[in-house]
Amino acid sequence: MRPTAQNIRAMLSACLWVTVVLLAGVAPVAAVPRENHEEKEANLKQQATGGLFHKWTFDKEATKSIPGGFVPLSSGAGVSGIWSIEHDETAPSAPNVVMGTSVCEESTCFRLLIAQGLEYEYPDLTMRIRSADGVAGVGGFVFALRDAQNFYAVLVDLGAKRAQVIRVIEGVTTVLGQTAVTLKPIDWHSLRVQRNTIVSKDFIEAFVDGVLALSVEDQMLGTGQVGVVMQGKTTWFFDTLHAVPLFSHRPLSSPAAY
């Protein structure tokens, strides 16, 4: 006996129902394991013990050398970036700055300079930045870094006058937010990045020249290292880096159930 159209529809509906049930029982797998509540509380206590309040002006460093306490990393193909202490009397904290140069043409190239031995869950980061010609280039802060393939970054494109928050997981970049920014008519611009939390939501805020530019929610990555970053082909200058933990905004216990 040939199956009727009604029987065929019934069989297809049954198959679809079984597929939905099976898929519903499969939990999504994150590329990077997330912290549970106990791990977050332990990290908070560690953040509050001190030792994470740092300011770098680089003025006592020897020129033509990599800044002490920092290590270069590279994400993406191509030649590694070049980092060195240079003399610059125009710097906000003269005479020394950090200069970074990347010759990689691809936007997937990230050249990182990471502070060693320091990990933050909710960092408050500030610094002053400028590009070689004052108008072109992309650079900013990197944080929550686990390795060269897993991190957050806040980037400022001085030529396009744009700010971005990105997440890199296993080398794959996701833009979490971007917006146009108004830059002040000055040589050295300011960049501030805060990672904060309200109840169970983590969010990232970026301030350019003192103005809030972006606020995005994401909690894929947890505690990690911090540093500076360049994207693509550029030469950037960095000065007066501050890094402190924003632990005072972190709840000490789980929120009440209402």
Please state what every model-predicted region is.
Residues A62-V98, C109:
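Extracellular glycan-recognition surfaces and repeat-rich motifs
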Residues T101-V165:
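Secretory/extracellular carbohydrate-interaction modules
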Residues F58, M127, H189-S215:
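Carbohydrate-binding surfaces in secreted/extracellular proteins
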Residues S215-D239:
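Flexible glycan-contacting loops in extracellular carbohydrate-active proteins
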Residues S13-G25:
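Bacterial N-terminal signal peptides
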Residues F58, D239-A243:
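Extracellular beta-strand elements of beta-rich domains used
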Residues I169-S190:
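Short, aromatic/His-centered strand-loop micro-motif at the edge of beta-sheets
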Residues R34-G76, H249-Y258:
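Extracellular carbohydrate-recognition regions
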